[in-house]
Swiss-Prot record:
InterPro entries: Flavodoxin_fold, Flavoprotein-like_sf, FMN-dep_NADH:Q_OxRdtase_AzoR1, NADH:quinone_OxRdtase_FMN_depd. HAMAP family: Azoreductase_type1 (MF_01216). It comes from Thiobacillus denitrificans (strain ATCC 25259 / T1). It catalyses: 2 a quinone + NADH + H(+) = 2 a 1,4-benzosemiquinone + NAD(+); N,N-dimethyl-1,4-phenylenediamine + anthranilate + 2 NAD(+) = 2-(4-dimethylaminophenyl)diazenylbenzoate + 2 NADH + 2 H(+). Quinone reductase that provides resistance to thiol-specific stress caused by electrophilic quinones. This is FMN-dependent NADH:quinone oxidoreductase. FMN binds at S9. Keywords: Flavoprotein, FMN, NAD, Oxidoreductase.
């Protein structure tokens, strides 16, 4: 089984979402002997710029060396997503949405003709057959509430790319709920993996 883990928290040593991702991969590692994990930090992710847009709009066979260089990081990120059976996206909610670094990662992997394509019936996602776990933490925003713009957007954009099997596990309102938010989320991780294990085992 090939897992792509994307960490978006600005915190490194005291991150709730990183701990949840660690737990998820620990449980998977106990069950999957040949588990392969690629870790990707969203921090420092390059933003789409004019050179990127021009290169991406150029036919691949017609791109010059500068254009290929402009898309090199994006190509690497796309390859990681395409190779993964399971995505683990660990993200806090900042100011009601996802961190800018995670949005930048999405912009780098949402590539026409690679991860989605336009058809006469509308856009079609090409990253089908994958499972995504979105591990979310927040200080005060309740996941699923009217002020949560992070998880609905992630579910939508993943579905747009063809990843429609998305599970959200939330340790939300941590400032109000304290340790109970983290404990409940950890238990949810274990329960979800137990439930999903038959399908995950088949994928592995």
């Amino acid at each position: 089984m090939r897992v792509l883990r994307v960490d978006a928290s600005a915190r490194v040593d005291d991150s709730v979402t990183r701990r949840l991702a660690d737990l998820m991969l620990e449980i998977l590692g106990e069950r999957v002997p040949d588990l392969s994990v690629v870790r990707r930090e969203a921090a420092g992710m390059p933003f789409v710029d004019d050179a990127w847009v021009g290169a991406n709009s150029t036919d691949p066979e017609a791109r010059d060396s500068a254009q290929r260089w402009a898309l090199a990081k994006s190509d690497e990120l796309v390859s990681e997503v395409m190779a993964a059976d399971v995505l683990v996206i660990a993200t806090p909610i900042y100011n009601f949405g996802v961190p800018a670094s995670l949005k930048a990662w999405v912009d780098q992997v949402a590539r026409a003709r690679l991860t989605f394509r336009d058809t006469e019936y509308g856009p079609e996602g090409l990253l089908t057959g994958k499972k995504a776990y979105v591990l979310v933490a927040s200080g005060g925003t309740e996941v699923g509430s009217d002020i949560d713009f992070a998880t609905p957007w992630l579910e939508f954009v993943l579905g747009f790319l063809g990843i429609t099997d998305v599970e959200v596990i939330a340790a939300d309102r941590g400032m109000l709920r304290g340790d109970s938010a983290r404990q409940n989320a950890a238990e949810h991780v274990a329960d979800v993996l137990e439930r999903d294990w038959p399908a995950l085992a088949e994928a592995s």
